[in-house]
Amino acid sequence: MKKLFGLLVCLFLLSSCDDGDLVVESFNFDDVSIQKCPDKDPLFKINGQELLLLDIPSSFFPNEITPDGQPRIATVSSENRIIYRKYDAKLNDNSVICSTVPPATPLVQQEWNAVEGGTIEITTTQNTITDPDTGEVTITGYNHRIKFINVEFVNGQTSFAYEDYFFGDYITAP
């Protein structure tokens, strides 16, 4: 009887083992700068084998200051997409995103897409320098602070969400 019970316990443990698939419940791109391809709209961050991509028209980044408390708002949709990808190898450069024909490797292991309805907030300020001798102020660029509000990512039946996620600062020339 003890042997039968032991066999049943072993079978149960073997059948309940994890299959090894990676389950993403969050990501961290805090220490990574935003990048952009020279001739394409998407903004993205690369962190090792991970990619976080914001595909939004450049018209959301005019060189105009947003009033205090009134950021530009874009709703996550088929035109304003946020995508998280996990690759099978480290991304050494931006060729995965910027190439007309993407390289054969690395391969996407998982892709999580933000569902429609979340919010992308963009607050724009001027970057300036002041000449110490003349006091003349020169605009050196515009800083676009990007936040995701109530954004949910899905992959099949699994999802995770961010109530408030700071994507980063994207700087444009004056």
Each model region followed by its residue ranges:
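Bacterial Sec-dependent N-terminal signal peptides
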Residues: 11-39, 174
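A general structural signal for short secondary-structure junctions and capping/turn motifs
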Residues: 2, 35-36, 136-137
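Sec-dependent signal peptide recognition
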Residues: 2-8
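Edge beta-strand at a domain terminus
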Residues: 144-174
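Surface-exposed helix/loop patches within compact recognition domains
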Residues: 41, 45-138
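Flexible beta-edge/linker motif
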Residues: 140-142
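Generic structural motif
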Residues: 20, 49, 59, 125-129, ...
